[in-house]
């Protein structure tokens, strides 16, 4: 029985346990490295200001007073944790190297002090240059020595100190190099080295840290204690310093910067100070369970603890924690362990002063002779508060001091003022111990955060303020908090679909309005748009590049900055700030580390804008002499750079503005010279027949706005895909070089269903949809238009990155997140006789389609070589082979078509039809004409093809035939092509379009009647000719009569056998078969009885060819609309139709034509009343 067992308290320092001896030594030797590292972190967080102060501070803080024995402690700290000793020779070499670095740095500091006191002294400038170079060389050598194979981990803490010193040294060269007499190219070289070394040093530190941590993973609690101490100590001595490396980028952080470390570190005296490894199944993982998963940052404001008695020992048994987020909202957590509210001891409740220290009294109790297993728990603990050192106690204070594990940031002052960390949360791991053969375990785990992570997000108007996004107060749906990669100073946020990340409240410490710029540090597996809202209003939206590939680990190089170039203000001293991402496909990953707010003054803004404009202008050219512009510099980009220059301040940089303006004008002229398009700025459309742009009449030219600096065009949708909205231009053969690739590119503000074609041997075709941004101007900007009506391109506006590009290739349907497009085409041999040219076409054939585009360019990209050259030669040969085949085919088809057309007329003057020419014969001839292929391009039927001349020649004669036929037929709309226009209707009838594209009159009821009054010449002879079809029983009748008698009629039934035209005979037995062949498919062209007297259609003036097979290459397609154009659409009548005629001699000047039936359905194809020849 437990109450009969004598408990024995075993002090841990009395056990003969070598592991305990090592840990005790760690506490005694590890303090100095922790003290120095925390002091350095404090210095980098608070004293990182422009000037020589950083160099002096590093010398005074570290390199000027640390002795060789102190450096030995840095090495010993990690050696003991990983149980790996550095060989004596390598240890001595490392310490000697560090001492040498300190001596070299001291000499450099002396030279720097002397130069600072007398910066114009040439000798002092030379001295500081020499000593900088010597120290730089020494650091390069030393840091390489600290990466000695097999000893990277124990050397890591001195590696990071040397790396930090090297970055500081290079920062001095970038900041003061020109003052030392270095030329700008050398200074820029040092800057590039600085950036590259930030990447390299960060990678080495993270790789080495992760390897060392992974090596310490184990299975029991003793191994976890060592694992956790390594994680905690190296966070303080390595990772925190690495997280501040980016601040050495003096061009990104030119003024004092406020940073925060949001990561958490853990202490647990029950586990870490235990003299034994607790006998607990899977103890390592159970201990690690006490580490909180990634979460938005919170700050503990209440703690209640209850005791539990385990084997006669009263220990911490459970607790209740509540916290507040950065918005001040309370967060209630589930209770930990066994919590009894009635017996809870109050530790803290709504107290704004956090705890900076714990004094713990762990107990390790073993049962008597009958029970050798331990009870491990916390018998008591005292909590000390910041500011006043006030103490709160659970039962009693102890001797295990958290300051031994997490020292103050400055040992010279009172720890309640100079503390480095505060207690942020308390978790609990518990093992019941009732299982036979195991210990009992009650282990509170204390979570600590660095004091730089403040409970609010306060913006300093004099500093760059970095706000980790993990300090938001509310996550948005779809956002998760993930473990930081180690170099960010805390956890980060992730999204895999578009939307806002989290809501953040910021407090402005200063008077309003203060202007700010913003940067977002992000990583992404896809191109995306990042947007920012302030107080619920979107102030920025910009396109940014991917920074990593899917599946890649998060590294320092994975992160980049999304910069808001437009200054903005906060409307209130406490405002919301939200970062979001969209316009990317779900499943990609987007990470946000932090956002940064940069205060802007008039001088700073002018200098920033000038520097940005200078970089943008210089980046346009291939060299500093500005002979040419880069191939990838688009015309749109030049316009945007011009806007940057135009918006520079006349007050601060007038001369520089004029110089840059001349350069950007030169770049624009060079862009115009290489552009093979005529009128790229859309001065007009259809102005010249064979030059410039041709387009449909619904296209409008718009003047420049906030997106386009120059004119652009708007293409609307169309209600009929056979009559698309189009814009095209021909690139003349004389402008093209043989065996060269050309590129079409431009800028699309927004589009839907915009088709882009490049045509030569074949058609390169893309359909491009670009999501529009709407207005670029945020709601807070009242007037983006100047007083004279021109757009104010200098006003704050929503931006996207003009440098992003999405280049489509043949066959793709691009859903562009970029507004740029590009499409290339290869040109083979050029021949002015063939005059093949290149056609540039933009087309929209849907009702919802639309596009706004400008800055179009067609320019030479590169000569063709290798595979590309072979491919274009193959395409050229294939095109010529098909061209020859087409010529042979065209000769045959043209001959047949011409014979059919000539047969319609009495002579070669084509001014009179043959007496027996009827409408069916004209249609048949027209169909043969339309068998001539390549009269027009299938991609756009207004562009002439190779056979356009002969096609138009015959089409003109077909039109003449129709005209003469219409003049000869005195019945108006006798073919019902215009519905029921000119006909009188009684009852219900309809005009329907059959599946062979012929319009017919359908009389479905016996009481219905259709009639027309026709004026004639008395005494002349006429022929009434009707082509019709009768369904069902009864008869269909077409009657001609005058007022008084003189009546004649044509009757139709499905049981009549007689001669028909053309050569069709019908019997009663044929009715069913004819029905099946015809199919009975009608499409109504009549909109109802009330519209019967209106004209429903007109004959189009443009008849393009019908293609019966694919054109020259597989890339060319038939135009489905060709079958709907002109009289060529008419096909021969289906079987069952008959043509009847009679002679009629009117006695008056008016006759009536009446159509009706007795039963069933009567279908009339055409009614003709032809004047006989004299």
UniProtKB/Swiss-Prot annotation:
CDD domains: delta_endotoxin_C. Keywords: Sporulation, Toxin, Virulence. The keyword DNA-binding does not apply. One of its GO terms (molecular function) is signaling receptor binding. InterPro entries: Cry1Ac-like_dom-VII, Cry_V, Galactose-bd-like_sf, Pest_crys, Pest_crys_dom-III, Pest_crys_dom_I, Pest_crys_N_sf, Pest_cryst_cen_dom_sf. Gene3D superfamilies: Galactose-binding domain-like, Pesticidal crystal protein, central domain, Pesticidal crystal protein, N-terminal domain. It comes from the Bacteria. GO terms for biological process: sporulation resulting in formation of a cellular spore; symbiont-mediated killing of host cell. The keyword Nucleus does not apply. Pfam families: Cry1Ac_D5 (PF17997), Cry1Ac_dom-VII (PF21463), Endotoxin_C (PF03944), Endotoxin_M (PF00555), Endotoxin_N (PF03945). Promotes colloidosmotic lysis by binding to the midgut epithelial cells of many lepidopteran larvae. Belongs to the delta endotoxin family. Toxic segment of the protein is located in the N-terminus. This is Pesticidal crystal protein Cry1Fa.
């Amino acid at each position: 029985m437990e109450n009969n067992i004598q408990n024995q308290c075993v002090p841990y320092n009395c056990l003969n346990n070598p592991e305990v001896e090592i840990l005790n030594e760690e506490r005694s030797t590890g303090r100095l490295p922790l003290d120095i590292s925390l002091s350095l972190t404090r210095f980098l967080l608070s004293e990182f200001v422009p000037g020589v102060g950083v160099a002096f501070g590093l010398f005074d803080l570290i390199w000027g007073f640390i002795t060789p024995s102190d450096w030995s402690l840095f090495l010993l700290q990690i050696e003991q944790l990983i149980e790996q000793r550095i060989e004596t020779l390598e240890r001595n070499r490392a310490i000697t190297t560090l001492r040498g670095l300190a001596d070299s740095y001291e000499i450099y500091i002396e030279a720097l002090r002397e130069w600072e006191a007398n910066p114009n002294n040439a000798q002092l400038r030379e001295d500081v240059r020499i000593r900088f170079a010597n120290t730089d060389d020494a650091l390069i050598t030393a840091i390489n020595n600290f990466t000695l194979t097999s000893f990277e981990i124990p050397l890591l803490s001195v590696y990071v100190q040397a790396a930090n010193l090297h970055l500081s040294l290079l920062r001095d060269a970038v900041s003061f190099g020109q003052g030392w007499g270095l030329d700008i190219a050398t200074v820029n070289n040092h800057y590039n080295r600085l950036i590259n070394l930030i990447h390299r040093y960060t990678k080495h530190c993270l790789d080495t840290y992760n390897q060392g941590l992974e090596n310490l993973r184990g299975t029991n609690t003793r191994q976890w204690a060592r694992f956790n101490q390594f994680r905690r100590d190296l966070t303080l001595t390595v990772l925190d310093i690495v997280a501040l490396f980016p601040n050495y980028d003096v061009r990104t952080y030119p003024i004092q910067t406020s940073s925060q470390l949001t990561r958490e570190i853990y202490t647990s005296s029950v586990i870490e100070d235990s003299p034994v490894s607790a006998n607990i199944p899977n103890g390592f993982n159970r201990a690690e369970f006490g580490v909180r998963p990634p979460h938005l940052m919170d700050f503990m404001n209440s703690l209640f603890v209850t005791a539990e008695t385990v084997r006669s020992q009263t220990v911490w048994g459970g607790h209740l924690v509540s916290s507040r987020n950065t918005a001040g909202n309370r967060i209630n957590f589930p209770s930990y362990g066994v919590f009894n509210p009635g017996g809870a001891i109050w530790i803290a409740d709504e107290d704004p002063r956090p705890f900076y220290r714990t004094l713990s009294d762990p107990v390790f109790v073993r049962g008597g002779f009958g029970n050798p297993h331990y009870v491990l728990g916390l018998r008591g603990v005292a909590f000390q508060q910041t500011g006043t050192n006030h103490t709160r106690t659970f039962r009693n204070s102890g001797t295990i001091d958290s300051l031994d594990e997490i020292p103050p940031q400055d040992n010279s002052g009172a720890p309640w003022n100079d503390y480095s960390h505060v207690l942020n949360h308390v978790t609990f791991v518990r093992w019941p111990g009732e299982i036979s053969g195991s210990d009992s375990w009650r282990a509170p785990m204390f979570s600590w955060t660095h004091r730089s992570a403040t409970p609010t997000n306060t913006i300093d108007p004099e500093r760059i303020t970095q706000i980790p996004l993990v300090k938001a107060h509310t996550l948005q749906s779809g956002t998760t908090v993930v473990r930081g990669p180690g170099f960010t100073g805390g956890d980060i946020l992730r999204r895999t679909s578009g939307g806002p990340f989290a809501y953040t409240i910021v407090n402005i410490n200063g008077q309003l309005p203060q202007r700010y710029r913003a940067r977002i540090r992000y990583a992404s597996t896809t191109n995306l748009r990042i947007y920012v809202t302030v107080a619920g209003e979107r102030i920025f939206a910009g396109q940014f590049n991917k920074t990593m590939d899917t599946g890649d680990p998060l590294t320092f190089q994975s992160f980049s900055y999304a910069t808001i170039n437009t200054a903005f203000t906060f409307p209130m001293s406490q405002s919301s700030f939200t970062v979001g991402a969209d316009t990317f496909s779900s499943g990609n990953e987007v990470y946000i580390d932090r956002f940064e707010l940069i205060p802007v003054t008039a001088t700073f803004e002018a200098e920033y804008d000038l520097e940005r404009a200078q970089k943008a202008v210089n980046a346009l050219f291939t060299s500093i002499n500005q002979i040419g512009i880069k191939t990838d510099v688009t015309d749109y980009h030049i316009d945007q750079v011009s806007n940057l220059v135009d918006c520079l301040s006349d007050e601060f940089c007038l001369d520089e503005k004029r110089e840059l303006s001349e350069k950007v004008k030169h770049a624009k002229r060079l862009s115009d010279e290489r552009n093979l398009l005529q009128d790229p700025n859309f001065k007009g459309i259809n102005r010249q027949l064979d030059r410039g742009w041709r387009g449909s009449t619904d296209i409008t030219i718009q003047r420049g706005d906030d997106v386009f600096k120059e004119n652009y065009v708007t293409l609307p949708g169309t209600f009929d895909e056979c009559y698309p909205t189009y814009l095209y231009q021909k690139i003349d053969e004389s402008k093209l070089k043989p065996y060269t690739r050309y590129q079409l590119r431009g800028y699309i503000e927004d589009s839907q269903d915009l088709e882009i074609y490049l045509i030569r041997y074949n058609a390169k075709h893309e359909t491009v949809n670009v999501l529009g941004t709407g207005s670029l101007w945020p709601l807070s900007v009242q007037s983006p238009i100047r007083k004279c009506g021109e757009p104010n391109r200098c006003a704050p506006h929503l931006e996207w990155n003009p440098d992003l590009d999405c280049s489509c290739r043949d066959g793709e349907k691009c859903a562009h997140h970029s507004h740029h497009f590009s499409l290339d085409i290869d040109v083979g041999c050029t021949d002015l006789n063939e005059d093949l040219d290149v056609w540039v076409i933009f087309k929209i054939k849907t009702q919802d389609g639309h596009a706004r585009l400008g800055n179009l360019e067609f320019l030479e990209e590169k000569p063709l070589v290798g595979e590309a050259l072979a491919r274009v030669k193959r395409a050229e040969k294939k095109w010529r082979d098909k061209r020859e085949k087409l010529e042979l085919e065209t000769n045959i088809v043209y001959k047949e078509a011409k014979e059919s057309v000539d047969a319609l007329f009495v002579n070669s003057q084509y001014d009179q039809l043959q007496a027996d020419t009827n409408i069916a014969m004209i249609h048949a001839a027209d169909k043969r004409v339309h068998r001539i292929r390549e009269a027009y391009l299938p991609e756009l039927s207004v562009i002439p093809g190779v056979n356009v001349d002969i096609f138009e020649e015959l089409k003109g004669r077909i039109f003449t035939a129709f005209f003469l036929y219409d003049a000869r037929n005195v019945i108006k709309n006798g073919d019902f092509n215009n519905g029921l226009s000119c006909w009188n209707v009684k009852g219900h009838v309809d005009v329907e379009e059959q599946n062979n594209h012929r319009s017919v009159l359908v009389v479905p009821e016996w009481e219905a009647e259709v009639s027309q009054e026709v004026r004639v010449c008395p005494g002349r002879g006429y022929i009434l000719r009707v082509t019709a079809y009768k369904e069902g029983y009864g008869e269909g009748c077409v009657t001609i009569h005058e007022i008084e008698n003189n009546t004649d009629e044509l009757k139709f039934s499905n049981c009549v056998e007689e001669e028909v035209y053309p050569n069709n005979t019908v019997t009663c037995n044929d009715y069913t078969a004819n029905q099946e062949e015809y199919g009975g498919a009608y499409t109504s062209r009549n909109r109802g009885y009330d519209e019967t007297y209106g004209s429903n259609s007109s004959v189009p003036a443009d008849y393009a060819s019908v293609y019966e097979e694919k054109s020259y290459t597989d890339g060319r397609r038939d135009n489905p609309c060709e079958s709907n154009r002109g009289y060529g659409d008419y096909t021969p009548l289906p079987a069952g139709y008959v043509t009847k005629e009679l002679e009629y001699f009117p006695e008056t000047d008016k006759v009536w034509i009446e159509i009706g039936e007795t039963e069933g359905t009567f279908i009339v194809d055409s009614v003709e009343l032809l004047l006989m020849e004299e």
